[in-house]
Amino acid sequence: MSADDSFPMDQISSLFPQLENIQLVGAKGPQQIFTATLKSNFAPVMLRVVPTEEAGIFGWDPEFIVRSLTIVEQSHQGLLHVYEVGQAGPFTFIISEHPPYPRMADMETLPQISPQAALNLVRNMAEGLLTLHRKNIFHGGITPKLICLREDGGDALLLPINIYPAQPPVDMGDFASPEWVTGAETTFTPGMDIYALGLALYILLTRKTPMEAGFAMPSSLIKCSDAVDSAVSRAINPDTRERYRDLGGFITDLDKAIANPSGRNAASIPPPSSSPAIPALNMQKGQSNIYYYLIPALIVGIVPVSYTHLRAHETRGNL
């Protein structure tokens, strides 16, 4: 977007007197994205504004605003804080926390984290989302671009608002669930969020996508337990009948995995054959691959070809 297309900065400044140091950092269609600082507490924030008459392009309809206002009232260590949602002048806007941590889309800049840390990160986000699911608010747009990772291994932070609710699976890329891409589900469900968190966990554990890893279970690539394999494979099962029904079940199994994260040493495990047999539906202890679970996702193009491809998709455009 050229400078001539941007909203006048004096107009933005006058409409948002609670902010200072406002800087335009990107755009997506009619939506413009600014970084700024809250005057009240000096917190770094991100301001997203869309002309109200065009807000429907992104799904920013009255129902979206009502859901977002509910999110503003929530506070959890696994969720980025959403400070304000509403209308100002001709714009509909969202003001959210903007921490200085790298995004999961840029995780190659961070050192490898332990299985325990990866499990804790995803559990923390899952627990935060559960507070919203209990109010029948489902994200439906989780991607690595919306997940911040602290370099010190602390809590992951997920932006709890689906910024482009009208546009998945295009903007979600490989994190869109199979049922959303195929049209089997036309509204957001808990399972869609679970699928995205499960895929995030696989990548955090292995630094690979399932396809890059030949559909191997995490324990075939790193030292982790069967409990870790079980939680990951069930979360990303493309069959919604076999996937976790709710985040509570996922969190329960994550807790089991956190209690016993270590397992066999991946170096001592022979690599899976080039033509692995399709395992039975219910994962057995020690099973070495997730081939069965991901074949349907591969057919509809859900499983990412590579993490490099995924990152390129996620970082294309703007924040």
Predicted regions and their residues:
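Activation segment signature within eukaryotic-like protein kinase domains
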Residues: 121-122
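AlphaC helix of the protein kinase catalytic domain
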Residues: 104-113
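Conserved small/polar residues in nucleotide/adenosyl-binding loops
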Residues: 308-315
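Short beta-strand micro-motifs within the conserved protein kinase catalytic domain, predominantly
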Residues: 81-91
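Protein kinase catalytic-loop region centered on the HRD/HxD motif
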Residues: 127-137
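ATP-binding glycine-rich loop module of kinase domains
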Residues: 36-62
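C-terminal lobe helix-coil module of Hanks-type protein kinase domains
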Residues: 171-265
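Conserved short submotifs of the Hanks-type protein kinase catalytic core
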Residues: 89-102
